[in-house]
Amino acid sequence: VFYPVILFIGLIRIFNKKENFFSYKQKIFANQNYTQIRQSDFLIHFASIGELNSIKFLVDRLNNKKIVLSCSTLSSFELSKKLYPNLISIFLPLDFFWNVNIFLSKTNFKKILWIDSEIWPNWLMISKKKNLKNILVNGRVSDKSYVRWSKYQNLSKIIGEQ
């Protein structure tokens, strides 16, 4: 039901240069190079360039581990590839049940690290079912977000347990 809407929005974003076909294909269809990703232990997700700049200490500490870096924007993807050419950079599949489930079934991550306040309910619930540990790094909740999340107490509880 939502797929035509999602595809239409994607075309608008591509037309407005907010996405390209490569990024949108990875986000919507969980279309990745799973041969490389399957070998990785950690997924580190950041949304913006600022969040990417804040993960240097994490990447340095995990230097002997196989890491996949995931992002949300074209600019953070390009900078990620430039700063960490030896790591795999991808666009995170969007938080739809089928998308996340396909992606996580084809990977072998041990931990997912979410930078700042990236909270994706389907990602958290499905990764919990697959016994993946989720870690929120540098997370914070603004007063506005707290009010919004408190309206969904059951979901907030599930997320808080992660």
Regions found by a protein language model. Give the residues of each.
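A hydrophobic membrane-anchoring feature enriched in long, contiguous, low-charge segments
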Residues: 1-12
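Active-site and donor-binding regions of nucleotide-sugar-utilizing enzymes
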Residues: 11-32, 38-162
